[in-house]
Regions:
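Residues forming anionic-ligand binding surfaces in small-molecule and nucleic-acid pockets
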Residues: 9-14, 54-79, 176-183
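A structural supersecondary motif
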Residues: 48-54, 60, 212
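A carboxyl-terminal module marker
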Residues: 1, 65, 79-217
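A residue-level signal for beta-strand positions that form part of recognition/binding surfaces
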Residues: 10, 45-48, 69, 121, ...
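Extended, well-folded interaction surfaces typified by the phenylalanyl-tRNA synthetase beta subunit core
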Residues: 1-49, 213
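Generic, well-ordered alpha-helical scaffold segments in large soluble proteins
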Residues: 16, 31, 35-39, 54-57, ...
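Domain-wide signal for the mature, well-folded portions of proteins, strongly enriched
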Residues: 34, 45-50, 72, 78, ...
Length: 217
């Protein structure tokens, strides 16, 4: 409550000894934001993570729908919000590429929790399946954590990530000729993602085009 995060309606413990633990959490992020608040005086730049379980309501048998989640929250007074956000994004990308040998996708998401930013929130995708969210904390919550700090978070459904098929490792024969990098400047619509743009050259330049990446925005 000190952070302005509302306690959402969810499964409750019967005969709870403390009203603060009565409602079972449906997300790990609020817990991490409280942990961040408790540690802001110890460091200007840090991150925390947790693999834990949450409950998303009840099933048809009136039993708790339990989900295993990976939650990561980064806090920094020395990095701007863009740098911190892409640092978290890169953590998730490396995790996916090292374990599943696949790239992640992202699409715009609508906030469903009071701590989520109304604009800067995205769904994490793998094989066109939703596995989590990544975003910036709501400005109101961020100011109560620290007025000068940047705070970003991500939460991944571990079961959905585990269920994704692992791609085989493929080795390409080294080129006989030295590689050449080309810098190309393009102007794209404001809401166009690089993932969508990259579909334009899939299957093109076979044997010549080895890869593409954004070097500046």
């Amino acid at each position: 409550k000190a952070l302005g995060i509302e306690v959402e309606n969810n499964v409750k413990l019967a005969n709870a000894t403390n009203p603060n633990i009565e409602t079972i959490r449906n997300s790990i992020i609020p817990t991490q934001l409280c942990q961040v608040k408790s540690n802001t005086s110890y460091s200007n730049d840090f991150g925390i993570f947790e693999i834990g379980r949450v409950v998303k309501g009840l099933d048809e048998n009136n039993l708790c729908i339990e989900q295993k989640k990976l939650a990561i929250t980064l806090f920094s007074k020395v990095k701007d919000i863009k740098t911190l956000y892409f640092e978290l994004r890169d953590m998730l990308v490396v995790l996916s590429e090292d374990i599943k040998h696949k790239s992640l996708g992202f699409k715009k998401a609508e906030p469903t929790h009071s701590y989520e930013h109304p604009v800067n929130l995205y769904t994490i995708m793998i094989d066109n399946e939703e596995i989590g969210t990544i975003g910036i904390v709501h400005p109101t919550v961020g100011k109560k954590l620290d007025k000068k700090a940047s705070v970003v978070f991500a939460e991944v459904d571990m079961n959905a990530f585990t269920d994704a098929q692992t791609a085989p490792i493929v080795y390409d024969e080294p080129s006989k000729f030295p590689p050449i990098d080309y810098d190309i400047s393009v102007v794209v619509p404001e809401k166009l993602f690089f993932e969508d743009l990259s579909k334009c050259w899939i299957g093109k330049g076979e044997g010549i085009l080895k890869g593409t990446k954004i070097v500046d925005t």
